[in-house]
Amino acid sequence: MIQFTQKEIEHLRKKKNECPQAILRLEEEVKDILEEPLLIPKTGIGNWSLYYYCPDCSVKLDFNRHSPKAHRCPVCGKIWTGSPYYESWWWIVSMENYEAAFRMALLYQIAERKDCADTVSYTHL
C-alpha cells in the first residue's frame, strides 16, 4: 500500500522542522517496541479486548507488556489469569504492534529513521 506520494513525503520532511514535537511524540509512542524484543505470538491467538475487564469491578485491567499471564484489576487488586484474559492480552499486544508499525513507517519516511524501517520489515516475516 502506498500511503504517500514522493512529493507528499518531501513536503512532510520539510514540515518536520516546523513541528519537531510531532516527531518526538511518534518516537515516544514507539519507544517500547524499539527498545524491547518484539512480541509476536507463535500461534494464532487473540480475543476481544472487551474481555480485558475485571468481572467484579467492571473496569479495564492494568495492561503490562511484561505480564502475559497475570492481569491486575486497578480497583480491587485481584489478579486474573487464564482465558479470556491471556488471549485478550495478546490482542492488545497485536494492536500495539500494528499501531507502532504504522508510526515507525512514518518515522522512516519523514524522519528517515532506518532503525524503524528495520523493525517494521521484521514484523512482516
Report residues per predicted region.
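Extracellular glycan-targeting catalytic surfaces
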Residues: M1-L125
